From Swiss-Prot:
Primary localization class, coarse: cytoplasm
EC numbers, comma separated: 3.6.1.31
Protein name as it appears in the record: Phosphoribosyl-ATP pyrophosphatase
Broadest EC class assigned to this enzyme: hydrolase
Record key words, sorted: Amino-acid biosynthesis, ATP-binding, Cytoplasm, Histidine biosynthesis, Hydrolase, Nucleotide-binding
Gene Ontology biological process terms in this record: L-histidine biosynthetic process
UniProt catalytic activity: 1-(5-phospho-beta-D-ribosyl)-ATP + H2O = 1-(5-phospho-beta-D-ribosyl)-5'-AMP + diphosphate + H(+)
Pathway: Amino-acid biosynthesis; L-histidine biosynthesis; L-histidine from 5-phospho-alpha-D-ribose 1-diphosphate: step 2/9
Location of this chain's protein in the cell: Cytoplasm
UniProt GO molecular function: ATP binding; phosphoribosyl-ATP diphosphatase activity
HAMAP family (UniProt xref): HisE
Family assignment from sequence similarity: Belongs to the PRA-PH family.
GO cellular component labels: cytoplasm
Length: 94
């Protein structure tokens, strides 16, 4: 099974940032600045690790999804894309 949903999610994130709707969580997070976005990624990473150690599989999957979403927002905040990460992963597999 492929995970094209990450590419679609990345596009939704970029669209929400472009639209600048203050009702959008994505836009509010992005607008709060790089420091806050990075802090949120850290929080989600810890929650994912805790879920892996102390909670069930369903909770782990939920936290992993949150982490991936916030990581995509962080990449967008730095002007990077999922494709940049994929290229690096491919380079490492050679």
């Amino acid at each position: 099974m492929s995970c094209h949903v990450l590419e679609r999610l990345e596009e939704v994130i970029r669209q929400r940032i472009r639209e600048g709707n203050p009702q959008s969580y994505t836009y509010r997070l992005y607008s709060s600045g790089l420091h806050n976005v990075a802090r949120k990624v850290g929080e989600e990473a810890v929650e994912t690790a805790v879920a892996a150690l102390a909670e069930g599989e369903e909770r782990l999957v939920q936290e992993a999804a949150d982490l991936l979403y916030h990581l995509l927002v962080l990449l967008a905040a730095k002007g990077l894309a999922l494709a940049d990460v994929c290229k690096e992963l491919e380079r490492r597999m050679k």
